[in-house]
Amino acid sequence: MLIIRNPATGATIAELQQDDAQSISAKYLAARAAQPAWAAQPLPNRIDVLRRFRDALTSDVERLAAVLTSETGKPIRQSRNEIKGSTGRIDFFLESTEGAIATRAVHTAANMREQISHEPLGVVANISAWNYPYFVGGNVFVPALLTGNAVLYKPSEFATLTGIEIGKLLHRSGVPQHIFAVLVGGGAIGSELIKQPIDGVFFTGSYATGQRIAREVGPRMLK
């Protein structure tokens, strides 16, 4: 079990079943199977889904801030500001994704056309930090979802409840269940996650953990 404690009081506020190798593999396989259909959705559809997620954050700031403060210990005002500020970043991604991934010609001749086009990576791991989970996580999973990827989201064990809340809001907003999956646990869960045949890994955390991730995924030339 993963025990979540309030760092200000030491009180236990939740006990959660941790993922294991079997459940991580199952979540990966489900994400892999679901991702092509998500990528096939027209971009405006995915934009609408993430816009609903932004609206859900905006309408639930107080409750979400209370959860964030209870498990990280940051002042409630800072938690509110983080959630409110993250909606501005989401707006940026909503407004800029279409132009960023648009196919563009770089050379055209009588018998040749060269162009740059973009495709989703596929299934990506998002290993996030505890101190600003809405900023740090959202900087990865929002553009990843907008561009047609499936996300296996491993929040810090010190911000797990917030990670679960993010997952619930995304699913209620229209992100399919297996396109965004939350993994529960500490460093061992992250280590097991990156052993899966994922297509990319995005990490924010300590230098030592970053080195371990690089040693695991570097030979596979992951993004």
Regions found by a protein language model. Name each.
Residues 1-112:
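N-terminal Rossmann-like NAD(P)+-binding subdomain of aldehyde/semialdehyde dehydrogenases
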Residues 16-25, 173-183:
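Histidine- and aromatic-rich ligand-binding microenvironments
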Residues 17, 127, 152-156, 183, ...:
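Active-site-adjacent beta-strand anchor residues
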Residues 22, 59, 63, 74, ...:
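Short alpha-helical
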Residues 31-34, 144, 163, 217:
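Small-residue (primarily alanine) positions within well-ordered alpha-helices
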Residues 90, 163-166, 193, 213:
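Hydrophobic packing residues within well-ordered alpha-helices of enzyme cores
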Residues 105-177:
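Conserved small-residue-rich beta-alpha loop and adjacent elements
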Residues 123, 174-223:
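Conserved NAD(P)+-binding/catalytic subdomain of aldehyde/semialdehyde dehydrogenases
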